[in-house]
Amino acid sequence: MSIPFSNTHYRIPQGFGNLLEGLTREILREQPDNIPAFAAAYFESLLEKREKTNFDPAEWGSKVEDRFYNNHAFEEQEPPEKSDPKQEESQVSGKEEETSVTILDSSEEDKEKEEVAAVKIQAAFRGHVAREEVKKMKTDSLQNEEKEENSEDTGFTSRTHEK
């Protein structure tokens, strides 16, 4: 007898989730009519690629997941054992210099990326504004033409009162 709402969890082999994610992504991208045949062709191409390049996406994905879930970089580190104060100072100053350089490099790269993104956003907005102006000009000109046609059809002309 099975329990319909059981609290059991099945263990999925490492890397299998990544393979299924890749297949799902390609199915959504390609929208094939025959999904099982497409999946078979997709897995065959992955096997060929793995044989040619010695790169296994399932293995790579399992390593990435393992690194993500087993990363101990953010745990508290034990204080280093006491040694010569001069050595500690040189080690600390060297680390500070390295981190400051990498922070500057990354911030410069980030600034460049932000500038490129800002230019793209500004260009898109300017294009949007220009399209709206053109649309407004078209509707204004159509309305003016309709008014002129209506005034000609009725025979009435608009008078301006002169003083």
From Swiss-Prot:
Residues 114-143 form the IQ domain. Keywords: Membrane. PROSITE patterns: IQ. It holds the Pfam family RIIa. It comes from the Eukaryota. InterPro entries: cAMP_dep_PK_reg_su_I/II_a/b (IPR003117), DD_CABYR_SP17 (IPR047579), IQ_motif_EF-hand-BS (IPR000048), Sp17 (IPR012105). This is Sperm surface protein Sp17. The lineage of its organism: Eukaryota, Metazoa, Chordata, Craniata, Vertebrata. The gene is SPA17.
